């Protein structure tokens, strides 16, 4: 039995609140249970120097956590003058995931930056960030179409992510903190809505996992992501 009473394949209650802030072209408050992340997508009519004149756009991301998003206060990274390794790893993952969902040539020489700011953490902050960022990105692109900055939609489809793991000898989906901290194995999976995988990150924290357990976790991830993408579509249809 999971601490929350959820079944092995059951994701937490997920809410995607669009237009959460006033100024960004796309903004979403994404909630995976008690994990809450604000995702804002900002459009700039330029690209990085190394892309200038190549007729392609760019999608990038930044990630951060409020000092008291966790049980005890964490010092702001800005106070130390540099980002931590975990932060850089996560924001690169978010950016790679979003770029996989966009035709960069169709975007033209424009850049979209998605900022993911965790305001409350209870496990799965990176997967929640990717899920919310995809919706914020879709809204930003729709804004670009409405304002004449794009003629057609460069998004190839929705992208979402979920964590899976081995907890008490059982494969489970969408780990909250109490499960994540005690899991034998922790894995993050990012997928497109057509079922193609963008990224699989897995680590045996306490005990190695078998090939069958890997397959079980991937199957749970696909089922969970299918459920999450339906929630993305429903949010964007509102």
UniProtKB/Swiss-Prot annotation:
Q: Which GO terms describe its biological process?
A: rRNA catabolic process; rRNA processing; tRNA processing
Q: Any idea which GO molecular function terms this record carries?
A: 3'-5'-RNA exonuclease activity; tRNA binding; tRNA nucleotidyltransferase activity
Per the UniProt entry, the Enzyme Commission number(s) are: 2.7.7.56
> InterPro entries, from UniProt?
ExoRNase_PH_dom1, ExoRNase_PH_dom2, ExoRNase_PH_dom2_sf, PNPase/RNase_PH_dom_sf, Ribosomal_Su5_D2-typ_SF, RNase_PH, RNase_PH_bac-type, RNase_PH_CS
Q: Which Gene3D superfamilies does UniProt cross-reference here?
A: GHMP Kinase, N-terminal domain (3.30.230.70)
Binding, phosphate: 86, 124-126
UniProt xrefs under NCBIfam families = RNasePH
Quaternary context: Homohexameric ring arranged as a trimer of dimers.
Q: What is this protein called?
A: Ribonuclease PH
